[in-house]
Structures are given as C-alpha cells and as structure tokens.
Regions:
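ATP-dependent adenylation/nucleotidyltransferase module used to activate substrates
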Residues: 1-39, 43, 54, 65-182
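Intrinsically disordered, low-complexity segments
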Residues: 46-61
Length: 182
C-alpha cells in the first residue's frame, strides 16, 4: 500500500546487493544485517547449480563459482557475489558445443546443491518481510474486489503455469476457501 495515497503499490523493482549476506535484497537496507546495499539490477533470478556449471564450463572455469552466490539479472547479465562477470551469449557461436556438452556430462555428478541451498535460505531470510507485505497486499486487494460477489460466481483462470498457480494460491488463501473453481 502506498504510504502517500493509500493506493496499491507500484511494481517498480530496484534490487540491491547485500555484501554482508551475499544475496540480492529488495530493500536498500538489509533487514537482517542492517548494511546498506548497492544497486545491482532491476530483475534477478537464482542460477541453479546445473546452469552455474554450464556457465563455468563455457568460461573455461569449472567449479570456480561453486561456493559463490550466482544470480542472473535482466539482459542476460550474470553476477557472482554481487559483481557482474564478463559473459556474452553471442560469443557462444564460437564455442565447440559438443565439447561443452561432453565436459558437462563428465562433471555433472560432482555438482552439488549444498552451497546453492544455503544461499537460497539467506535470500529468503533477507527478503521475507517484503514478500509477506506483498502477499498481504495482494490478499487484501482480492478480498476488496470480491466482497460484492457470491463465492459460487467466482473462478480463477488457470493454465497450470507459474503465474496462474500463484494467483490460484493467493485467491484460495485470501478468501479462505479452497473450493473456488479454477
């Protein structure tokens, strides 16, 4: 909720990097350690161990980032411990894809989720307050939009994708009714 007008918040995203916690944060000040973050990007997603290993092989540095916090930002930018690394998709056309595939197959059994899971736990811890605020705002909006309708007249358009899955979950939780058609 916008503190000025009381309306819905805008979905403008500025993502910062917490050097202490080694994860992206959605608030300028990390709610866990209190350190001020530096601007990172406007969109970010975790790089899973499989993609991380492939990236390392392409860069000719297998397992170089295994214990690091690796993220993908908008524009196919990769960040390792908050620093952008040099990587260009267009350079892939000069690589031997068969050799990359072979090396990946040889190394994938040594790949691990241990450090990735630790980073995800830290990311969730550092961003849970914002997540909870967004969920509560969404549930409040759903309740306000449905207050004049009978539950039997409601349904959620459901394709099975991640967006409709999240929407169905939010509607079910907001209205405390798992029977809503979707």
């Amino acid at each position: 909720i916008c503190p000025s007008c009381g309306g819905r918040s805008d979905a403008i995203s500025e993502i910062f990097w917490c050097q202490e916690c080694q994860v992206p944060i959605y608030e300028k000040t990390c709610p866990v350690c209190g350190q001020e973050g530096k601007k990172l990007t406007s969109d970010v997603r975790p790089v899973f161990p499989e993609e991380r290993l492939l990236l390392e092989i392409i860069l000719e540095k297998p397992f170089a980032f295994e214990k690091d916090s690796v993220w993908n930002g908008n524009g196919n930018n990769y960040f390792v411990n908050g620093k952008k690394i040099k990587f260009s998709v267009k350079d892939l056309k000069n690589k031997d894809t068969d050799a990359i595939r072979k090396q990946y197959e040889e190394l994938k059994a040594q790949n691990t989720y241990q450090y990735f899971e630790e980073q995800m736990e830290r990311f969730i811890l550092c961003n849970k307050e914002r997540y909870n605020r967004i969920v509560e705002e969404a549930k409040g909006y759903i309740r306000s939009m449905t207050e004049n309708f009978d539950i039997t007249d409601m349904f959620v358009s459901f394709s099975g994708g991640k967006d409709s899955t999240v929407t169905a979950d939010l509607v079910t939780r907001a209205l405390s009714n798992p029977q809503i058609m979707h």
